[in-house]
Amino acid sequence: MIVKTRAVILREIKYRDQSKICSIYTREFGKMSIIIKGARNPKNRLSGLFSAGNVVDLVLYKKSSRDIQLATDGNLVLSPMVPEPDLERFAILYRIIDFVRHTTENDEKNLPLFTLLTGTLEQLYHTNVNFQQLYAWFLLRFVSLLGFQPSLRTCVFSGEELLPAIEALQLTELYFVMNPGGLALPKAAGSSLAKKQLIPVRLAMLLSALAATRLPAGDSIKADPREIEDLWNLLQEYCSLHLEHARGRKNLDIVSQILLK
């Protein structure tokens, strides 16, 4: 049957002389694979449309008996090349689409995840964007959508409200506990064997502020670059623990080196 959907291009592979096979994440069907015949022919109207990171409106000839569906038409909605190419933007882009590609299953519709992905890419493709801050926000929302939302307002062990306890005890550090995920008071976490990491209260408050932000624009969270780097390193470790498929891939190491320069 003929169907229309909006999709994010996650990966493109050359196929035969002039075609492409792409992994895409769609609004209606989740992740799927498509073939675009003649997509590498410069005379083809669809040439250039199916590049990683593009958001496109597609027309598909879809058959449930096929693993790879046929794309017959499409129009560009968003591109990382607009307003202009940026190395740091592409480094963040490939981290994001890599996470989605490796942690989702084919043919499982997830509209909240699609909305998160396209909303993040739309913001990423703007000018004057704090790329690292946006990436940290995406990691937190992404892992939360997949069922691993960390507890950031109350102690993950005792359930005690964190802000009053921080003020009363004049704390300078809290624990971030990897499993169960969330912040913990030192007195509650001290005897626990759970994997945990001491972090400054300032970093914990930045994490809470990030969680409360609908979609960061510019430098909406006031933090220096080192703090943002610490944030997304913490969240990367948290995601890697809970999303096994996101662990240890070479391309993540490469873009990490780019971002940390």
From Swiss-Prot:
One of its GO terms (biological process) is double-strand break repair. The keyword DNA damage applies. The keyword Electron transport does not apply. It comes from the Bacteria. Keywords: DNA damage, DNA recombination, DNA repair. GO terms for cellular component: bacterial nucleoid. Belongs to the RecO family. Involved in DNA repair and RecF pathway recombination. This is DNA repair protein RecO. It comes from Pelodictyon phaeoclathratiforme (strain DSM 5477 / BU-1). The gene is recO.
